[in-house]
A protein has these predicted regions:
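Bacterial N-terminal signal peptides that target proteins for export
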Residues: 4-15
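C-terminal segment of classical bacterial N-terminal signal peptides
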Residues: 21-31
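Short, compositionally biased P/S/T/A/G/V-rich stretches that sit at domain boundaries
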Residues: 32-69
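Aromatic/hydrophobic beta-strand junction motif of beta-rich domains
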Residues: 68-83
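Aromatic sugar-binding surface patches on proteins
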Residues: 103-116
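Surface-exposed, short loops/turns at beta-strand junctions within beta-sandwich domains
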Residues: 113-125
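Edge beta-strands of extracellular beta-sandwich domains
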Residues: 135-147
Length: 147
């Protein structure tokens, strides 16, 4: 009889653990399955910041800055809507390093602001390119001449 009680308790414990695991698993699955990532839909330079020119907000479709930039630092902020990969980021043909990013949106994430460090350059062409991580796998480019 003691053996039967022990087996019953062991079976009940196993079923309880299975139920808890299933419940936790379902809770996690609903958080993780938000659907496919949004394709890359836009890529823009939104701000240029330098010692000489200060912070300049860039209007969409601008081909150059209106202020003369330069000095000890030069930072460029880009806005990416959707999910991109394989970044190509250059200033006057030289690679530029990302120094930070900020999420746009929350749940779901809809894009990012990226800050790039082009310090050492006084003026020239900033180029930025990314490819969507999913269909339609489009590649988007933007560039601006920094005075």
């Amino acid at each position: 009889m003691e053996g039967d009680v022990f087996m019953f308790k062991k079976a009940a414990l196993g079923i309880s653990l299975l139920a808890i695991t299933a419940f936790v698993g379902l809770g996690m699955a609903t958080e993780a399955s938000g659907g496919p990532a949004a394709p890359l839909t836009s890529l823009n330079v939104v701000q240029v910041d330098s010692e000489q020119g200060g912070v300049e907000t860039i209007n969409p479709n601008s081909f150059s800055t209106t202020r003369d930039h330069g000095g000890k630092y030069l930072y460029i902020t880009t806005k990416e809507m959707g999910y991109g990969q394989n970044p190509f980021v250059k200033m006057n043909g030289f690679n530029v390093k990302s120094i930070g990013s900020t999420i746009i949106g929350g749940k779901p994430i809809v894009g990012w602001y990226y800050k790039w460090d082009a310090s050492g350059h006084q003026q020239g062409t900033f180029e930025y390119q990314k490819t969507s991580i999913n269909a339609p796998f489009n590649t988007m480019r933007t560039s601006i001449y920094i005075k």
